């Protein structure tokens, strides 16, 4: 009987620990990343993304530089400096809900555009 109680107690401890860990991981902030250039193409990947107010998106220069990120009507979010080095990145934090269209100025004509939906 004592052995059976110990067995159940150990199972209960494992279950409670697992639930606690999963809740802790779920509460961590979501970190989104958009690649600038992918598979030899002049694209943002992904080109459409949804995040919550207060969350950040990191833009990472992946290939085929130079790239920048310009948000239509939101100069405060734009990054006009060109990224030349692979892995070069910058982060944008969205404080207000809305749809934020962006493009890479040197490659907008090639369709390097995207949108971030902030809910």
Would you name each region that the model predicts?
Residues 2-10, 22-119:
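Extracytoplasmic copper-binding redox domains, predominantly the cupredoxin/blue-copper superfamily
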Residues 10-18:
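Sec-dependent signal peptide recognition
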């Amino acid at each position: 009987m004592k052995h059976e109680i110990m067995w159940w107690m150990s199972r209960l401890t494992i279950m409670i620990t697992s639930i606690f860990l999963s809740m802790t991981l779920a509460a961590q902030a979501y970190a989104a990343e958009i690649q600038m250039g992918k598979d030899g193409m002049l694209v943002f990947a992904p080109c459409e993304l949804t995040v919550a107010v207060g969350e950040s998106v990191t833009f990472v220069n992946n290939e085929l530089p130079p790239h920048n990120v310009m948000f239509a009507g939101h100069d405060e979010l734009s990054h006009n400096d060109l990224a030349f080095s692979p892995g070069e990145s910058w982060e944008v934090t969205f404080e207000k809900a809305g749809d934020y269209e962006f493009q890479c100025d040197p490659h907008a004509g090639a369709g390097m555009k995207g949108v971030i939906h902030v809910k």
